């Protein structure tokens, strides 16, 4: 919990895997495939994370750090529409306290929206230290069920580099919680169940015995619509 970090000195995940092939609340299935929750938990356990929380009409931006020294960095908050156009961009030099949760900034909802519809906008919150991105999170003004999500069109190119296979993914419009899969194959993607923001390209490693050509021909996507 970003507000009560000092109360929690360890985390227990229940449960990680299954001993039989059924639908369940485990974060990996019987065949060791990662479910969405497992990707999320991996990212939540990074050494430094940013998180956002709506407090009425105010957006509070937090950083949670496990480091034992203070971090000096830059907080970048960008509001985008679902076509990838920048609505507003704010930047601020910040200090992240050691081994605790820190409120970095608070912003008003209306100032972020700039007159746009909250059902058609998203926030990208990024914490940088020099040229290194410590963490980046996406946030929304309303629940996903209330978003006016567009119909995206994907570009997916499979390739191989230094013996590692990958896919390069982009979209013309926002695609939420995109799941990559290949039917009938035991395959691992380094990232999955992610938001694809228009104007960006995502390189995702693919652990499989399939060739890039086979990946290209057989890969499928699902997303929230």
What function would you assign to each model-found segment?
Residues 116-128, 209-225:
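Short, surface-exposed ligand- or partner-binding patches at beta-edge/loop junctions that are enriched
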């Amino acid at each position: 919990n970003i507000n009560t970090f000092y109360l929690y000195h360890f985390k227990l995940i229940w449960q990680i895997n299954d001993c039989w092939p059924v639908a369940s609340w485990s974060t990996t299935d019987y065949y060791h495939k990662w479910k969405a929750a497992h990707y999320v938990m991996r990212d939540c356990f990074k050494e430094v994370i940013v998180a956002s929380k709506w407090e009425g009409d105010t957006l509070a931006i937090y950083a949670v750090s496990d480091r034992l020294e203070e971090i000096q960095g830059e907080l970048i908050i960008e509001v985008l529409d679902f076509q990838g156009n920048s609505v507003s961009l704010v930047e601020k030099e910040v200090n992240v306290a050691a081994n605790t949760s820190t409120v970095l900034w608070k912003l008003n909802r209306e100032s972020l929206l700039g007159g746009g519809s909250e059902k058609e906008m998203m926030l990208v919150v990024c914490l940088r230290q020099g040229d290194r991105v410590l963490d980046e999170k996406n946030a929304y003004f309303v629940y996903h069920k209330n978003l006016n999500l567009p119909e995206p069109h994907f570009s997916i190119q499979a390739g191989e580099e230094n013996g590692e296979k990958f896919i390069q993914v982009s979209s013309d419009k926002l695609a939420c919680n995109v799941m990559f899969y290949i039917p009938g194959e035991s395959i691992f993607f380094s990232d999955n169940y992610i938001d694809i923001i228009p104007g960006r390209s995502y390189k995702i490693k693919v652990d499989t015995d399939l060739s890039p050509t086979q990946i290209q021909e057989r890969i499928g996507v699902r997303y929230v619509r």
